[in-house]
Amino acid sequence: MNAFSKFSQKQFRVFFSYKNNPVKLFSLFLFIQFFAVCNSEQNSEKKEILFRLISEFQIDLQKNLESAIRTKGIVGAIDVCRTISPQKEADLKKEFPGVLIKRISEKPRNPNHRPEVWETEIFNQWKESQKTGMAPYTVVLSKDREVRILQPIVLQSPTCLQCHGGPQDINPAVSKKIAELYPNDQAKGYKLGELRGAFSATW
């Protein structure tokens, strides 16, 4: 017997035991309604916070990368990208216990950034939508007390191609540095406008 069946039977037994007591039955319905409203309000608040954190993550990463490119060049910026993203993920997890925000991709540079099953399903939805001309869209999933958000990352700047484009876009020195840091790198061969990955948030 699965967990849902057990839960349903338990609900039925509670309802049956209360059916001859209108006061208890009314109280039960009020409790269920209150619980549902509380969950909905809590998830709504979580969603707002997650969107804000994703935005801050994206802005901080872009700001630091642009600064590193100006001062250290593309090769030096690779090290910055390699360290700042995991550090930002760890800082958010520490500041907001239970929150997990990370960048993921089906063609990751960091092997720890591969998508989970539910994320892969959404990637597949995005790819099917793109065939009809629809751009990837942000997906929000809410169930019980958990909220999940997947926000697409699309390559929009020619600068991104200097690390993620084809052989004609990537300087040999950059290719060498990437190979040293990421021997199993898959995050190349992209074109402008293509789906690079996503910001994934769970709370």
Which ranges hold each PLM region?
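Hydrophobic helical h-region of N-terminal Sec-dependent signal peptides
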Residues: L28-I32
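Cys/His-rich metal-chelating microdomains
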Residues: G166
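Short, cysteine/histidine-rich loop/knuckle motifs that typically chelate Zn2+
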Residues: Q162
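Extracytoplasmic c-type cytochrome modules immediately beyond a signal peptide or single-pass transmembrane anchor
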Residues: E41-T159, D169-W203
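Bacterial N-terminal signal peptides that target proteins for export
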Residues: F4-F26
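C-terminal motif of bacterial Sec signal peptides marking the signal peptidase cleavage site
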Residues: A36-V37
